[in-house]
Amino acid sequence: MATVNVRDTLVNLTSRLIQINTVNPPGLTSEASSFIKDWLGSLGYSCEIREYVKGKPNVVARVGKGSPTLILNGHMDVVPPGDESRWSYPPFSGKVIGDRIYGRGATDMKGGLAVVMLVFAELAPLVEGAGSGTLVFSATADEEVGGHAGVEALVKDGVLVGDAAIVAEPTGFNRYCIGEKGLCQLRLIARGRPAHGSLPILGENAILKLVKAIEGAQRIVEEFNRNIKLPPDVEEAALNAASIYGQEASRRGLGLSLEDFRRVIGSVSFNPGVIRGGSKVNMVPDHAELELDMRVPPGVDPAGLIEAVKSGLRGLAEVEPIDVSSPNYTPRDSPIVRLIEDGIRRLGAEPKPIIMTGATDGRYLRARGIPTVIYGPGELTLAHAYDEYVTVNDLVNTYNVMLYASSRFFNIPSPG
């Protein structure tokens, strides 16, 4: 690739990507994928389009041959902007004000996508010239609703196979994510007996049974949490993540401590999210149900948690899994993690591992045995927020770290 102004290129790519509306739902990525394909094509790199769900194409490019293989990944879809009147600038403007680029997805993760695009473009000719090793770029759909038409499908299809991966979700330039909590969403169903509301003793109120089931489930989770022992590197990462949220809570005056966040990040969280029950106010309801969201830290088996809830609520509520995925992490001594750490130190900062409380596409890569590190520009606390932005400085710093780590992965001198 010809010499480029890294700063200007990253700003222009990020702003242009923000301007392409990829809100999910519906998560349509045809325009974004065409833009990415054309941009890489203008540099001489061909792309493959993989579309598993109509309107949600994924872009894949690869150069080189043989091992080792490194995957660079970013997702194209974003969450809805919410009330647009609460934005200082239009959410799809990609407005550049000083060091900040504003817009929905600036942090999560059009900025990260711009970084992996440019890293691929800069490193590709060097990998080709080295004669061995494969560099894979993937811009994927559907992450904000589970990644089923994106990374999950590409992994199942054998398109994304490698020896290591970097997923450019927002971490901030001096932090990197080694793992994430697993998902354990359950449906609790309470059944009763209908009767006229004026004589409730003739019926059995399913809503009241469900209330008892919710309280029981919470006690079960609290007891379950008392027996959790995290791996040492996960414990450190949980504390670092807690520090991020603790600082933000302090800024907002929420009265939450570092220990409050450490406890919830390092244990099973409990959030009754959706409740339904009854059909008419003057009837004793015979059916009520809850959708319960729990997040499980690395080192904990969701199957054991589900069994504990089922056993504890037997006779009170039925328990059905809605969506379950295992927690996952990449050990800190993995080569790709060490390379990211080295890259951060080269910029004069001390690298800090964290874990994510939510899920990323990294879980599908780790499930296939691919050591994966989450590393990209932007602050976690800005993702999905009004006036979401990414700083230009963060874009440039994460680009330099990722370019260094990726080149050293192939034993190529870093061009940066």
Language-model segment annotations:
Residues A2-E84, H287-E291, P302-A308, D394:
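N-terminal helical capping/dimerization or prosegment-like subdomains
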Residues N21, A61, L72-H75, V116, ...:
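Buried hydrophobic positions in well-ordered alpha/beta secondary-structure cores of metabolic enzymes
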Residues S42, E48, P81, E223-V274, ...:
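An extended, acidic, His-containing surface patch that forms the Zn2+-binding/catalytic region
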Residues S67-V136, Y386, V392, N397:
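Active-site metal-coordination/substrate-binding segment of hydrolases
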Residues I97-D99, V119-V136, V161, A217-I228, ...:
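Phosphate-handling active-site elements
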Residues M109-Q185, R262-R263:
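Acidic/histidine-rich catalytic neighborhood of metal-dependent amide-processing enzymes
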Residues S132, V136-S138, E143, L186-R187, ...:
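Structural helix-boundary/capping segments
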Residues K156-K310:
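Midchain, well-structured core segments that form catalytic/ion-binding scaffolds
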